[in-house]
Amino acid sequence: MAAITAAMVKELRERTGLGMMECKKALVEAEGNVETAIEELRKSSGLKAAKKAGRTAAEGVSLVKVSDDNTVAFILEVNSETDFVARDDNFMNFANDVLNVAFEKGETDVAKLMEGDLEAKREALVQKIGENITVRRIIKVEGPVVGGYVHSNNKIASVVALTAGNEELARDIAMHVAAVNPRVGKPDDMPAEELEKEKEIIKAQPDMEGKPAEIVEKMMGGRIKKFLAENSLVEQPFVKNPDQKVGDLIKSAGGDLVGFIRLEVGEGIEKEEVDFAAEVAAAAGTGKA
């Protein structure tokens, strides 16, 4: 039996787009012959998974797992092509499997995490449901007190870390993060480039035109302060009690904000615009050249 080398597996993966375990299995069956392995994969359903990989997966779920002592949380996003599949039990079971393994191993590197059993499960799921499935990102959050929240549709998940307080408080603030979507934790965290961009927008507003420089400067200061208050978590009115700022709520528990993470399914992914008439025509072999 021919020895299967890492280079052979790498070549087959690059040429087919299939997972490591499936490529290795194909090479073993082909006794190390890459071309034979490719031919056999083309005959089997194995290559179907690779073909699906070219399609945009912009639906899916965001999930959270928090440790029993509320000091560590893992938050992840797993994508599918359609919302219908995202609500399928098989898809949800896979997403939870990935989350649990990531949590147990303490792993946030998706490529490393997906080596072995999880990649085999992903490929099997692609075969079963006929859609591209991707594990997009996994983030670990640590702190003295950590709380997580997942919106009822599993599309938005968030985690908050505090220096003090309890799990219920951290979870409530995570719920606020999910609902309000602050840009930063505190005003000082706002990136300089975003501040400059906002200043340019304010300067261009009609009521700034023709005013003395000192008046413009004063108006600018007030509007920037408002911008920072609206977009900084600690300055926002708490969603469950708008009379209290989130920062004051945290302080009342003797704590401070360490940080937060909010994941929304599909954010930053450019969805494909599908021309269904053209797709049907192409499938029927009637598409025009």
Curated annotation (Swiss-Prot):
It is found in: Cytoplasm. One of its GO terms (molecular function) is translation elongation factor activity. GO terms for cellular component: cytoplasm. Residues 82-85 are annotated as: Involved in Mg(2+) ion dislocation from EF-Tu. PROSITE patterns: EF_TS_1, EF_TS_2. InterPro entries: EF-Ts_dimer_sf (IPR036402), Transl_elong_EFTs/EF1B (IPR001816), Transl_elong_EFTs/EF1B_dimer (IPR014039), Transl_elong_Ts_CS (IPR018101), UBA-like_sf (IPR009060). Keywords: Cytoplasm, Elongation factor, Protein biosynthesis. Associates with the EF-Tu.GDP complex and induces the exchange of GDP to GTP. It remains bound to the aminoacyl-tRNA.EF-Tu.GTP complex up to the GTP hydrolysis stage on the ribosome. This is Elongation factor Ts. It comes from Marinobacter nauticus (strain ATCC 700491 / DSM 11845 / VT8).
